[in-house]
Amino acid sequence: MKPIVCDKGHGMVQAGFAGDEAPKVVFPCVVGRPRDGLNPNESYVGEEGHANRDILTLKDPMEHGIVNNWDDMEKIWHYTFYNELRVDPEEHPVLLTEAPYNPKANREKMTQIMFESFDVPAMYVSMQSVLYLYSSGRTTGVVLDLGERVSHTVPVYEGYALPHGILRLDLGGRDLTDYLIEIMTERGYTYTTSAEREIVRDIKEKLCYVALDYEQEMEKTTKGWTIDKTYVLPDGQEITIEAERFMCPEVLFQPSVIGKESSGIHEATRNSILKCPVDTRRDMYGNILMTGGTTMLHGIKERMTKELNALVPSSMKVKVVVPPESECSVWIGGSILASLSTFHQMWITKDEYEEHGAAIVHRKCV
């Protein structure tokens, strides 16, 4: 039977069958319960929960990619198999994805639930960054994943993540939105409600760009260069955005402007590569893949390339790639991996689980 590939990222669950070009189902990763609290056992999963959000409290059982509510996570997997894919998990191997720094106890719990609650014949857990690399046709490189709240650099060599080289940055798209709100507030605009926050996020995505040279860009504006853009608010009012367009994304390269002591994304990538074996570094510098919504900012690839070239030996060729953003990239990588003829040797089988217990996941899913 075809393996099932199930990915959870950016608040959505994507599931389908190995070998397919796209997931069969995509739905919100939420469990909703009535706000009145009269029946705490009543719950609505996925689209059902989303459709009734006016009367429900919606919760995602994961935070920063890490499960923190296993009962709800099990409900979501049950809903995925039986309601969305309409299959019996006892008949399909299952490939699940995980974020970097997924705690050991969580990996074991995922394994235990798959075998004990769903009675799957085999399962595997793969890091999302590795699968993202697969989807771009590579098995070696560094994945810089710019998330909403946190970002990660994950070096991968010949299809395996190098754990000692993984770095976490407490820097993400949300910081850029917050900084833009701060700058716009200084100019006399106010953004306090969640609807207003959404407007600022939209301004960021549509009008902001990364300066190739920040100081030079600043100088241009003081010398009368016009980089103004107009944004039409939902009520028809117009606001003009000027130097904020490039000041906002500068946070990625100079987190100190918002008071963060974190490294810039270019330094984190370099530091991540320096933690890898010397003989792998040339391949790493030549395959730097950026992913996440923030990578859509115009100019980010060129600036990243420039900053890295200034940090690394001139003998190293730096190549930064920003593949066309596909919400399904990780899932597609999983579909490719689970359909490889050699992959059947990698699955954790039911027999292995029964013999070694859930800790087998650390040995087989590295």
UniProtKB/Swiss-Prot annotation:
UniProt xrefs under PROSITE patterns: ACTINS_2, ACTINS_ACT_LIKE
Keyword tags: ATP-binding, Cytoplasm, Cytoskeleton, Nucleotide-binding
Recorded GO MF terms: ATP binding
GO cellular component, one term: cytoplasm
Tagged with keyword Nucleotide-binding: yes
A Pfam family matched in the record: Actin
InterPro entries (UniProt xref): Actin, Actin/actin-like_CS, Actin_CS, ATPase_NBD
Gene3D superfamilies, per database record: 3.30.420.40, Actin, Chain A, domain 4 (3.90.640.10)
Chief place of localization: cytoplasm
Locations listed in the record: Cytoplasm, Cytoskeleton
Quaternary structure note: Polymerization of globular actin (G-actin) leads to a structural filament (F-actin) in the form of a two-stranded helix. The binding of profilin to monomeric G-actin cause the sequestration of actin into profilactin complexes, and prevents the polymerization.
Known function: Actins are highly conserved proteins that are involved in various types of cell motility and are ubiquitously expressed in all eukaryotic cells. Essential component of cell cytoskeleton; plays an important role in cytoplasmic streaming, cell shape determination, cell division, organelle movement and extension growth.
Family (UniProt): Belongs to the actin family.
Additional note from the record: There are 8 actin genes in A.thaliana.
Name of protein: Putative actin-9
